[in-house]
């Protein structure tokens, strides 16, 4: 196989997926002591040994990795055997678990965090602490764009300045060449509206102005001296950053929030403010109702903080 073919094959698979599958194969071979190619009996015993220890979704991911390995190597896929499917069904029956969901971030909490960040930005500016001013200005833009667009963490990390068209006072046009929901890799453009308050567009303008960035990743690391990294956020850096923000703003249970809290919170706000399911799915980019309902069900439609005056669906869509 030529290097150019390998290059394109590597690009066809998301890095996170590749790493998780490699870890799953390593667990099967090294930690459990399995052999590849595997038999249906071996896969069943592997599942049975970890059925009460690992989350069901983790087991499904391990099975998917084993299936891919066999398919790529040209061997029969043992994970499709009826016995494997029955063992999985038995594990789900005997070890039921409620899926842990990130807490939805609500409008009142967004306001609380933004107020905190604005105060910290002002203090940093007055004390001429450029690194701190940079960091908090970046965080404000990340928070507001992430919430009002219902972006996942990986979408925030993929945003590139050259793919964003800024119209001051009106909005942003953000093109993502690829995302988790874009199976055909056709790319998609997302509109981000300018708002009267908690404005993501103004926050983005402020971030570009203070950072001086004109290309590359929108959101990057900043060291203690105020040097901005050339690379975007690492895959594991976003959740700790958000939790530090939530803790700094005084939110309780900060560890229960994650990058999914932005999308979950937006879905709850939109539902409480009269968006129908079709409008919400089109805006966020969900392709199936099941995916959307996982976010909507987590919201409390009677929560007062969701019912604060805010932009209408027509304003955002």
Which residues fall in each region the model found?
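Short, aromatic/basic-rich helix-turn unit that serves as a nucleic-acid recognition element
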Residues: 1-22, 46-55
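Short hydrophobic/aromatic segments of transmembrane alpha-helices and their interfaces
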Residues: 1-2, 10-11, 26, 93-95, ...
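Basic/aromatic-enriched alpha-helical hairpins
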Residues: 13-38, 68-75
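Conserved catalytic core of the tyrosine transesterase superfamily
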Residues: 17, 45-51, 57-262, 269-317
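General structural concept
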Residues: 29-54
């Amino acid at each position: 196989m030529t290097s150019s073919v390998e290059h394109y094959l590597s690009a066809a698979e998301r890095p996170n997926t590749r790493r998780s599958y490699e870890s799953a194969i390593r667990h099967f071979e090294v930690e459990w002591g399995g052999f590849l190619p595997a038999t249906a009996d071996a896969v069943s015993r592997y599942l049975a040994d970890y059925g009460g220890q690992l989350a069901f979704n983790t087991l499904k991911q391990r099975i998917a990795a084993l299936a891919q390995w066999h398919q790529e190597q040209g061997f029969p896929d043992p994970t499709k055997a009826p016995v494997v499917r029955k063992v999985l069904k038995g594990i789900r029956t005997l070890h039921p678990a409620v899926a842990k969901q990130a807490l939805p971030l609500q409008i009142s909490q967004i306001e609380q965090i933004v107020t905190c960040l604005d105060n910290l930005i002002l203090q940093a500016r007055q004390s001429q602490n450029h690194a701190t001013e940079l960091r908090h200005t970046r965080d404000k833009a990340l928070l507001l764009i992430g919430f009002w667009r219902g972006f996942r963490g990986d979408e925030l990390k993929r945003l590139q300045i050259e793919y964003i068209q800024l119209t001051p006072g009106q909005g942003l046009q953000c093109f993502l060449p690829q995302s988790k929901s874009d199976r055909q890799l056709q790319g998609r453009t997302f509109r981000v509206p300018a708002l009267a308050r908690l404005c993501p567009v103004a926050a983005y303008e402020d971030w570009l102005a203070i950072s001086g960035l004109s290309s590359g990743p929108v959101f990057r690391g900043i060291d203690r001296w105020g040097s901005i990294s050339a690379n975007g956020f690492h895959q594991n850096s976003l959740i700790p950053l958000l939790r530090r923000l939530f803790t700094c703003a005084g939110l309780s249970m900060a560890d229960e929030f994650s990058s999914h809290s932005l999308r979950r919170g937006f879905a709850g706000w939109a539902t409480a403010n009269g968006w129908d399911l079709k409008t919400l799915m089109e805006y966020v980019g969900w392709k199936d109702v099941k995916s959307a309902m996982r976010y909507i069900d987590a919201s409390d439609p009677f929560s007062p903080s969701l019912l604060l005056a805010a932009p209408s669906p027509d304003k955002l869509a």
